[in-house]
Amino acid sequence: MTAPPADLDAALTGLARVPTLLVALDFDGVLAPIVADPSTSRPLPGSAAAIRALAELPGTTVVLVSGRALGDLRAVAGFGAPVRLVGSHGGEFDDGPLVLTDEQRAAKEALERAARGVVDGEPGVRLEDKPAGVVVHVRGADPAVAERVLDAARTGPARLPGVAATEGKAVLEMAVVQVSKGLAIDTLRGRLGADAVLFAGDDVTDETAFARLGPGDVGIKVGDGDTAAAHRVGTLEDVTQVLEELLAARRR
């Protein structure tokens, strides 16, 4: 698209006028394409440039809010300060490590054992370890294998005491702390005293963030699928255009 739709353009214009603005963005499928090897994913150059410029503006905080582990997100995103990072669907903030209680550590060990029993020997499936839990990835698996593994994870480790499950596109994350992108948005808004929030996401896990937006905020769904977001764009290039429009409006 050459410019955001009229309703989104008007929303961005209003958003640009607030004194304290939080710009929160998912990474994969929003800033960077989803690829077979997640370690090779990088943000589109235009989006990266707009993010860096926005983050330098007074009263403007840009935060990447991703399902990736914080260290993984830092490695692929390529941003330093003042751009902020939140990983593990809000389970890891870049201002300090996540500390588990003894009970949570024991629950995580039990979760890891149960999850390993589900994925071991399954072709195209991998288990990712995170500070507060594990993630079952099935993007590389045959559809029948993927569904079998996800069903086993849903009915097994995901139901262990103290475990909260979050399902996304070809992934099932299980954690021993309650996390969501919606809670992360609430936390960031409170810490920053933000007058308004822009959030853009593409996955079902982003819907908790869209649900936390209120009057004056702007939610943008990237791609297809049901959503609570008020606005939608089709491609990552459209996201670049949105960020550039917001940057230009906030500089005025």
Regions found by a protein language model. Give the residues of each.
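Active-site phosphate-binding/coordination module
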Residues: 42-130
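A short secondary-structure junction motif
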Residues: 135-146
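Mg2+-dependent phosphoryl-transfer enzymes with acidic/Ser/Thr/Gly-rich catalytic loops
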Residues: 1-5, 18, 182-252
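Short amphipathic alpha-helices in soluble, non-transmembrane regions
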Residues: 111-115, 148-157
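Histidine/lysine/aspartate-rich catalytic loop segments that bind and position anionic ligands
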Residues: 133, 151-172
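Substrate-recognition "cap/lid" segment bordering the active-site pocket of phosphatases
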Residues: 86-113, 166-194
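Non-catalytic pre-domain segments flanking phosphatase-related domains
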Residues: 1-27, 31-35, 46, 189-190, ...
